[in-house]
Amino acid sequence: MNPPKEFNMDSTTVDPANSRVLEIIKKRYSCRRYRSDQVDDPRLDVMKEAVRWAPSACNRQPYLFNFVTDENTIKEIAQSVPLGPASVNEWIKSAPLIVAAVGQPELLWHKMTQVIDTDYHRTDAIIAMDHISLVATELGLGTCWVGWFHRKKVGKILKIKSGEEVVILMTVGFPESQPSSRKPRKELDELIVFK
């Protein structure tokens, strides 16, 4: 899939007041209840393309994304919590799809960046995962980031290679319902400073 023909980086033709991307960002929310329908192939294809076109340090794309649809594997992942009762992630079982971002911290490039205390493999994988989240929202899907999971256990479940690491998980599916209201956000002056 190539960039759309109407793709135009000419800033003089863009109307900032009508940002389609910002509208999608505002619509995205953490969905924890899904319908049982599987995510169809056309939607999966767009999510896969979002991974491919995501930026990464030096365009190395140092990750592999696992699209997990097997119900038993999803249940196993939901049980793999680092601490406390597994019931904290019970909601994950309703998702028809879990996307697992697997980073490659052992690549020479990433080992070199450790001198500056930067985990590029994680940063790159999370950027690509956010691209999935946004296109999924545009396609009428719900998503939720899952940070409370046991990396090594999930890595074993997914049979990832030695030297790789499960960076982050995301549930994806058709929402059971839409939220009745949006969660409040901080004021811009609490979040952004110009210097």
Language-model features: locations:
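Acidic, surface-exposed loops and disordered segments
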Residues: 1-195
